Structure formats: C-alpha cells, structure tokens
Amino acid sequence: DAVSGFHFEPIEINGKTIRVGTGIHDSSASLVPYLLNEREPFLLVSTGTWCISMNPFNHDPLTDEELKKDCLHYLNVYGKPVKSSRFFLGHLHDVHVSRLAEFFGVDYKSYRSVSFDRDVFEKCLAQKVFFKEGIPDGYIDKSVDLSAWDGFAPAYCQFITDLTRECSKSIDLVLNEGNERKKLIVTGGFSRNQKFM
C-alpha cells in the first residue's frame, strides 16, 4: 500500500525522538502546490531535460500501448496514482541546437534571441522536417539538409515547432478520453521559451 506524504513515524536518534516522513519523487513534489491550491482540474507539464506531463485527474489504468510509449504512474503526496508521460525534451533541444549552432556558425545561446514571427510559425506548422518519422535513434535525422534554411533563426523555428509537436503527443497520452483539461500549467525552463509556448 502507498503511504501518504503526510505520514510521519517517530524514531530515536542519539537519544532524541524525531519525526521522519516518506520522501517523494521530485516530479511528484512539483504537483504539491497545485494540488493544494488549484480549484479546477489541470494538467502539469514540468519541463527540463525531461518533460514530465502529469494528470492527477486521470484515474484510468495504464494500457500496454501507454507503457510502450513511456507512460507511468507517479504517486502524489496523498499516495494516489498520477498518470504521467515522459519525453526527452531538453536533451533533444540541446542536441539539435548544438547541431544548428555549429552549422550556422553562431553561439549555442542564439536560440534565446530568436523572436516569434507568426508568418514563419505558420510556415513551420505546415510541414514536418526534423521528426518526420518520430524521434530517430541517436535523436538526429541526419537526412535533414540544414542548408535548406538561410540562417539559424528560421531553422530553429522549424526545429522548435517540430519538437513542440512531438512533445504534444506525449501530453496527449495522459489526457482523459473526452475530458480534456481546461488548464495546462507549464513549469521549468521551457516555460520561458516563447517559441515553445
């Protein structure tokens, strides 16, 4: 049986009694302020090296297909399962931005100054380039011809659009059938990336 994150046991150390509680995974811990304060159902997307999408309101058991697509249950602070999916977002971003920066001869951090352009974004949405067949082994599709773009900014826009599209597939895995979340909370480094958001 799962133990609530609010359960404590008294133990004695060096003649003193202290209360010791259970630990929870950092992803589960990130849910706590929202579980305590949000009034309506939500889906939490915690971004960093991994993108962890967590739906504490989806109580459906994991299917074989979801397990194959890297879904799992975390436990919330109350010991209840939280349907979650994982996507290697930050790592994919780092690998591809490094490749783009090297090809175009710019600093790795150049992606931070690429501004959002609605027209460029619409063109990027109309095509899939970097992940035509999903995420390739080794994370990079070497058949993508980077010389198709006239600079780092448009290439990055296409990449981040394609990456976001792949990430949304991971988010979709934890939505309830016919019961989409009205509130999506994005935390972590990618919450500051305007092109991702």
Model region roles, listed by residue range:
Residues V3-G5:
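Gly/charged, well-structured mid-domain segments that form the phosphate/adenylate-handling core
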Residues I13-L184, R192-M197:
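Active-site core segments that coordinate phosphate-bearing ligands/cofactors
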